[in-house]
């Protein structure tokens, strides 16, 4: 049996697949799921992999061994572990070369049919499924949670309405009953409903749906459904699901009962040559007051007629996006005052009606993310928090906190807690995932639970300048040093559309002219300790920026701020916030990227224009 893909293999082959013209615009999350389902092949020495002129059968990803590539009998090159075969040939249709195994080898094979389906039909694979022409079948159950069956039925009823309203999906809701309905009946809310008796077929003949929601009905035999588990805060599911089924744990949060952890908890990202072991499946949070609802299961009124408050409506939309594979994730880099580019970005996304379901960040990006996610609750868009952060920067409060952090980073923690209160990461409806660096292990740590203000402090403790954040045995410093733009964090968390923003500029380094002419002047100039210190700073800035660029490439869309004069010195001028916001507003490159994100979101929301009649009328 083939071993799991290492982190380095996932990254390398995701990048390789993105180079294919046919797959260039395919979402990274879909390609990652294809990689997880790739079929292992083990060619023996002398075995022919493909012949010149034959139809391309798929893409091969070599894990071990060596393959010989020839054209017209001439050896062109040898493929070695980590290299791919067939990525560029997909668009051509036939193999331009012949490939033979030189030694016993192991590879992964992605069939052409699956790759073409991904490229031709922009249909999301949900939270771990694949691309399939049939409807997505979803089951619901409570795990480790005392929840009346009527409440589960009501949640299923409401999320079905939201899927129809928000996405235009054809949704079938199937419930158990004593009498079987022959076909599916469409209600005033656009949801198709059907009642089935035990052992009766679940799906009606001759009907096509985007999603089938099973409420108290077992999945048809031979079909592996997706399972939505309703779990309590801080609790783990107390049972295993259907073998092979993809699971979406949904944490039910009450707006009236804070249940956050007081201890900062995180998970280390795996090493390059390792893989994720015992990592729970990506989940989501459902923050709503279900105990006070007056809606009942079977209510076929349109969504607008139910009188749901803004918080409930927002929570159900987030849940619907998680179930159907439509979650949008943002990865925000660090960069001091340049982080207010992120503020402009978030404001524009709100104006463009692009949702944000997951947000990963480092350093200053975590401060912006905290003020956004900490106030994007109960139907609010998070813009109030961004205004408060802008006010803090303009009034000099951020500069004072940054200066105090030379002694202790508690100053930044106090500032955030004073503005946002005692919120915890696991209480936020928007999945907020700041990263930090643990110097005791050298690993990047994704902070998932604990005080929000403390997480911001740990993510932005720039080493050598600011004091570290000590959470024994961990010694946390700035997350930008191990993950400047945390795109991988979003992919692991279940984001389906990823936008990354690298706003830490690369700098222009102007070399000083030698004071003396000739070789002596050059020698003295190279010996200058002040010039060497400037070289060190410029190299550090360039290294951080380039690392951010490499991570950004694994997302679906990305923005890079480019170069600026004295970026490191300028990043500490927090009182210049209005100048940075004005510059961001004038940046047509950023605006173009945001419009592309809007277009990508609309394609994801409506499943594209090639739906083949699957959309609701």
Range-by-range predicted roles:
Residues 254-303, 307-313, 328, 377-419, ...:
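Non-catalytic peripheral regions of patatin-like phospholipases
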Residues 136-165:
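Glycine-rich phosphate-binding P-loop
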Residues 106, 111-139, 299-326:
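Extreme N-terminal, non-catalytic leader segments
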Residues 22, 43-104:
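Cyclic nucleotide-binding regulatory domains
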Residues 1-45, 89-91, 114-124:
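Cyclic nucleotide-binding regulatory module and flanking cytosolic helices
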Residues 141-145, 170-211, 216-222, 435, ...:
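P-loop/Walker-type NTP enzyme "switch/lid" segment
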Residues 219-235, 240-249:
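Inter-motif core of Ras-like GTPase G domains
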């Amino acid at each position: 049996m083939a071993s799991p893909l290492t982190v380095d293999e996932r990254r390398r082959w995701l990048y390789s697949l993105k180079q294919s013209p046919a797959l260039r615009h395919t979402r990274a999350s879909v390609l990652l799921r294809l990689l997880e389902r790739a079929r292992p092949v083990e060619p023996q020495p002398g075995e022919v992999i493909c012949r010149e002129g034959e139809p391309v059968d798929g893409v091969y990803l070599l894990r071990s061994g060596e393959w010989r590539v020839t054209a017209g009998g001439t050896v062109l090159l040898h493929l070695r572990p980590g290299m791919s075969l067939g990525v560029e040939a997909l668009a051509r249709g036939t193999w331009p070369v012949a490939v033979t195994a030189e030694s016993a080898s192991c590879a992964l094979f992605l069939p052409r049919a699956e790759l073409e389906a991904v490229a031709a039909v922009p249909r999301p694979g949900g939270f771990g499924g694949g691309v399939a022409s049939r409807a997505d079948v979803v089951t619901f159950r409570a795990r480790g949670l005392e929840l009346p069956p009527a409440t589960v039925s009501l949640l299923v009823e409401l999320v079905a309405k939201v899927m129809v309203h928000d996405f235009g999906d054809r949704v079938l809701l199937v419930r158990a009953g004593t009498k079987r309905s022959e076909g599916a009946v469409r209600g005033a809310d656009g949801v198709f409903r059907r009642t089935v008796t035990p052992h009766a077929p679940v799906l009606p003949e001759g009907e096509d749906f985007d999603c089938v929601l099973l409420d108290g009905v077992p999945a048809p035999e031979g079909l592996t459904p997706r399972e939505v588990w309703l779990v309590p805060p801080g609790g783990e599911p107390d049972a295993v699901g259907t073998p092979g089924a993809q699971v979406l744990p949904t944490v039910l949060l009450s707006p009236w009962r804070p249940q956050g952890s007081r201890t900062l908890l995180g998970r280390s990202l795996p090493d390059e040559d390792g893989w994720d072991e015992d990592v729970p499946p990506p989940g989501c949070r459902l923050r709503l007051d279900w105990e006070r609802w007056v809606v009942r299961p079977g209510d076929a009124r349109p969504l607008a007629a139910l009188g749901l408050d803004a918080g409930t409506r927002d929570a159900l939309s987030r849940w619907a996006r998680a179930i159907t594979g439509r979650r949008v994730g943002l990865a925000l880099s660090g960069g001091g005052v340049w982080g207010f580019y992120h503020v402009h970005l978030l404001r524009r996304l709100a104006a463009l009606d692009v949702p944000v379901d997951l947000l990963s960040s480092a350093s200053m990006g975590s401060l912006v993310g905290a003020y956004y996610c900490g106030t994007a609750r109960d139907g609010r868009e998070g813009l109030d928090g961004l205004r408060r952060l802008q006010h803090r920067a303009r009034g000099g409060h951020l500069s004072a906190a940054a200066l105090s952090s030379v002694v202790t980073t508690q100053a930044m923690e106090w500032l955030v807690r004073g503005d946002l209160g005692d919120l915890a990461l696991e209480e936020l409806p928007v999945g907020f995932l700041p990263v930090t660096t643990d110097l005791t292990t050298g690993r990047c740590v994704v902070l998932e639970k604990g005080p929000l203000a403390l997480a911001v402090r740990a993510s932005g403790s720039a080493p050598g300048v600011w004091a570290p954040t000590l959470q024994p045995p961990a010694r946390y410093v700035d997350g930008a040093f191990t993950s400047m733009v945390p795109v991988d964090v979003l992919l692991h968390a279940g984001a389906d559309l990823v936008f990354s923003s690298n706003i830490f500029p690369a700098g222009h380094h102007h070399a000083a002219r030698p004071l003396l002419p000739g070789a002596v002047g050059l020698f003295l100039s190279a010996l200058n300790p002040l010039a060497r210190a400037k070289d060190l700073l410029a190299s550090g800035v360039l290294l951080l920026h380039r690392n951010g660029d490499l991570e950004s490439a694994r997302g679906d869309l990305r923005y890079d701020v480019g170069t600026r004069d004295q970026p490191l010195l300028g990043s500490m001028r927090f009182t210049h916030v209005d100048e940075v916001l004005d510059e961001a507003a004038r940046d047509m490159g950023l605006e173009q990227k945001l419009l592309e994100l809007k277009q990508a979101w609309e394609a994801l929301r409506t499943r594209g224009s090639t739906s083949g009649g699957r959309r609701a009328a």
